[in-house]
Amino acid sequence: MYKLIIHGGISLNGSVITAGSKNSSLPILFASILANGPITLTNTPHLSDVSTTLRLLMDMGAEFILESDNSLFINGSKLTNLVAQYNLVKTMRASILALGPMLAKYGKAKISLPGGCAIGPRPVNLHLEALENLGATIKVKNGYIYATAKELIGTKIHFKQISVTATENIIMAATLATGITTIYNAAQEPEIVDLVKCLIKMGAIISGAGTSIIIIQGVDELSGVTYSVCPDRIEAGTYLVATAITGGKITIKNVHYQSMHAILEKLLETGADIKTNKNSIILDMKGKRPRAVNIKTSTYPNFPTDMQAQFTALNAIADGYSTITETIFENRFMHIPELSRMGANLVLKGNTVVCKGVKYLTGMPLIATDLRASASLVLAGLVATGTTTIERVYHLDRGYETIEEKLKLLGAQIERVQD
């Protein structure tokens, strides 16, 4: 097991290159099941969730080669094992995304109920009900989903609530269904748009991605392609907040700023100067203490839940009072006790944190609990006086590619050591 050791109080300055999107890579990897040939992905991030997905697909019969230049060759066209075992999916909720493609391509699937971050329930009923509407027969028994379908038939799907992974699962299943599928109340995230772009390149007929209504015309087969994964807007946002919290200046390269409007708007409210170019963002805090900002998470294009914890760390040392309200997931405040131990003035009231900014945080031993909470502890450690150690950094590795190395490029004193 590894831990991070951070000597805080240093202003971050420099530039970093954003990796490919975790939340785009995973569904595209599962989409390889649909293809009749190999897929080559470029800009693939080296993350533990990507590695877990590849191990899962390999266990099913897929073949892959992951290059050091972040390109990935994967052939998932001829699976021999239609079972996603618990030992491979227990750490990653995205494993449910194998269900739609397997049903569409092979007519059956057995998938363990997924694991992942312990940030409250994320029920899979939306996936299962929608697939049943397409014609699948589904049973849940002994922790596994058993699904069969002689044929998937296009229909109208009305999601009761917005779900990114359910939207992705049904899009993929519908690409090989007979007839037209229309998804209402679909998620609109950029990562869904990226998945759809890849599927269209494979031969799918899809319209409406990025809106609340997505229409899929089923086709007979999909082909292998070469595709570049979009940049990770959450990773980019995390480094922007890290720079703002330490009063520095950063250039983020390989980024689509158009997908980050809600994040950039809040950073402007903190007092940061921001300039955007075609594929880069420049943020300059000019040594200032950030101003507190109110946050309320919601579905895209509003403020993303995956940036809530990072802005909580920023508000902890910001000038003024703020509220942070979480509307997407229950129990996504497990970073609050650890930040409070560092000296943050945070009061949790239901799904809202009330924060009075303090001038200083104090470094100390911390324990990471989930992916984004881990990131908030790193940011707090960067601005704290003294030394901070963070245990269980495997949570970070699920969504951040070599985070300590990128922070070192910005001047941070941070190292990864083995216990």
Swiss-Prot record:
Pfam families per record: EPSP_synthase
Reaction equations catalysed: phosphoenolpyruvate + UDP-N-acetyl-alpha-D-glucosamine = UDP-N-acetyl-3-O-(1-carboxyvinyl)-alpha-D-glucosamine + phosphate
Keyword Cell wall biogenesis/degradation carried by entry: yes
Alphabetic keyword roster: Cell cycle, Cell division, Cell shape, Cell wall biogenesis/degradation, Cytoplasm, Peptidoglycan synthesis, Pyruvate, Transferase
Taxonomy, superkingdom: Bacteria
Record-linked SUPFAM superfamilies: EPT/RTPC-like (SSF55205)
GO MF annotation list: UDP-N-acetylglucosamine 1-carboxyvinyltransferase activity
Residues at which UDP-N-acetyl-alpha-D-glucosamine binds: 93, 306, 328
Pathway as given in its UniProt record: Cell wall biogenesis; peptidoglycan biosynthesis
GO biological process: cell division; cell wall organization; peptidoglycan biosynthetic process; regulation of cell shape; UDP-N-acetylgalactosamine biosynthetic process
Subcellular location: Cytoplasm
Keyword Cell division among record annotations: yes
Cited InterPro entries: Enolpyruvate_Tfrase_dom, Enolpyruvate_Tfrase_sf, MurA_subfamily, RNA3'P_cycl/enolpyr_Trfase_a/b, UDP_GlcNAc_COvinyl_MurA
Function description: Cell wall formation. Adds enolpyruvyl to UDP-N-acetylglucosamine.
Descriptive protein name: UDP-N-acetylglucosamine 1-carboxyvinyltransferase
Gene that this sequence comes from: murA
